[in-house]
Amino acid sequence: MCLRIGSSTRQNGRVNKEAVELFCAILALATLAGGIITLAALALEERMTWTNAWLTQVRASGIWIICLITTGAMLGSLYFSEHVGFAPCKLCWYQRIAMYSIAIISFVAALRNDKNIVRYTIVLAPMGLVVSTYHYLLEWYPNLETNVCSLDVPCTAVWFRELGFVTLCFMAGCAFITVIAVSLAVMRGQKIDSTSIHQEN
């Protein structure tokens, strides 16, 4: 009887983990879609009518959007490492440093309504994106490994691959791309506001 209960618990745990993996994958793709739309709106600003409405919303809530994305990514990474038991490699830690830093400073900035924080997010996010992109390539092409990681926790290990291509570092990359897009939108909005003020004076 005890063996059956233990087996059932492990099975339920596995189902829950797989459900979380799928949920996080879908959430990452939705985040990426938002980032791509924002980048497209920036490229087409003043050429298409829908871009103004989209960018207005992004600029108004930009810091909270960045905070929400990075905090979600931070909590997700902690769930997989601390609860599920996925050991983070050295590249994972580099991505965490960038992601966690953005999450903390954006939360403080959001509380203070300080949009100048994008000066830092626009630096940290690309750095994280470079690492996550390289990490993602290693997952598909292990021969690109340059002895960056240890043998105990190799960077080429793939804990899961949802929908055939979504891995943990892919999710991180989606978050970094969207943070970059939102940061650019906020920065351009600040520039437009500054130009308008100078013209009025």
Q: What do these predicted regions represent?
A:
Residues C2-K90, M99-I102, S106-N201:
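Secretory/periplasmic and organellar redox-cofactor proteins
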Residues W93:
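Cys/His-coordinated zinc-binding microdomains
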